[in-house]
Amino acid sequence: MQNQIDMVKDEAEVAASISAIKGEEWGNCSSVEDQPSFQEEEAAKVPYVGDKEPLSSLAAEYQSGSPILLEKIKILDSQYIGIRRTRGDGNCFFRSFMFSYLEHILESQDRAEVDRIKVNVEKCRKTLQNLGYTDFTFEDFFALFLEQLDDILQGTEESISYDELVNRSRDQSVSDYIVMFFRFVTAGDIRTRADFFEPFITGLSNATVDQFCKSSVEPMGEESDHIHITALSDALGVAIRVVYLDRSSCDSGGVTVNHHDFVPVGITNEKDEEASAPFITLLYRPGHYDILYPKPSCKVSDNVGK
């Protein structure tokens, strides 16, 4: 019971943090009405998954902006080796998670992790069936994700290279299908644990759990927040670190970069928590997620507040 209470407190804190960030004014738009078209134009310039870039490219965006943001980017630059941008089309969280996870498996060749997540994928399939989803509505999405898992493991005729992984992630027919896989998995977990998620959903949108899943989870192009991240992390058993880039400062006036680790439910002791340390790190700016690459020798927790 205490663990559940702690989880609720953590989720409430994250929800408040994200809401505060979303309330900030960003960019150089002259009015709120200008922002949607501006964002669409900017999004179209970025592929679904971009190239890996140095953090200096992020700093260049804010040279004439907030000194606090520039200071925070300096902190990020000391902790992270690069950033990979994703298209800001409402699917950026899922695309970032997709590429970061598959990239990790391709580089690590962690067959035990592939075996583990396949078990969770099968549980997610049964969850959807038990909820009344018909197989034809989601089966193709599940099959394509499992195919990618098999193809990134080396040693078979179907094995793919790193460049091919990038190409597939930029291929709409592949990328969108995997995003839909994640959306179904997320919706299934939210519906199954409706009692847990309901307070956060009603607090954000005044919608029921069913309405929220139908309008804000399952459709392509709908943005993700802490509810989606928690559900996907728990369903697949994959920890996710989200680093927040905002204008906030410490009570003392200093500058820190806050992050939150979404640790899958069921992690109850320090040994398990250490074993499940996030290998996926995402950067959150208002309404958008990109991928961050930690420097191998850096302990992020030393200088980045949790």
Curated annotation (Swiss-Prot):
InterPro entries: OTU_dom (IPR003323), Otubain (IPR016615), Papain-like_cys_pep_sf (IPR038765), Peptidase_C65_otubain (IPR019400), Peptidase_C65_otubain_sub1 (IPR042468), Peptidase_C65_otubain_sub2 (IPR042467)
Catalytic reactions of this protein: Thiol-dependent hydrolysis of ester, thioester, amide, peptide and isopeptide bonds formed by the C-terminal Gly of ubiquitin (a 76-residue protein attached to proteins as an intracellular targeting signal)
Lineage: Eukaryota, Viridiplantae, Streptophyta, Embryophyta, Tracheophyta
GO molecular function, one term: K48-linked deubiquitinase activity
One Pfam family of this chain: Peptidase_C65
Domain of life: Eukaryota
Known regulation of activity: Cleavage activities for 'Lys-48'- and 'Lys-63'-linked ubiquitin (UB) tetramers is inhibited by UB aldehyde and N-ethylmaleimide but not by the metalloprotease inhibitors 1,10-phenanthroline and EDTA, and the serine protease inhibitor phenylmethylsulfonyl fluoride.
Gene name, Swiss-Prot/TrEMBL: OTU1
pH dependence: Optimum pH is 7.
Keyword ATP-binding belongs to the record: no
Active site annotation, chain numbering: D89, C92 (nucleophile), H259, H288
Protein name: OVARIAN TUMOR DOMAIN-containing deubiquitinating enzyme 1
Sequence similarity: Belongs to the peptidase C65 family.
OTU domain location: 81-295
UniProt keyword Disulfide bond, yes or no: no
GO aspect biological process, one term: protein K48-linked deubiquitination
Keyword annotations from UniProtKB, A to Z: Hydrolase, Protease, Thiol protease, Ubl conjugation pathway
EC number: 3.4.19.12
Function noted in UniProt: Hydrolase that can remove conjugated ubiquitin from proteins in vitro and may therefore play an important regulatory role at the level of protein turnover by preventing degradation. Cysteine protease with a preference for Met-1 and 'Lys-48' over 'Lys-63'-linked ubiquitin (UB) tetramers (e.g. Ub2, Ub3 and Ub4) as substrates.
Outcome when changing C92S: Abolished cleavage activities for 'Lys-48'- and 'Lys-63'-linked ubiquitin (UB) tetramers and of linear UB polymer
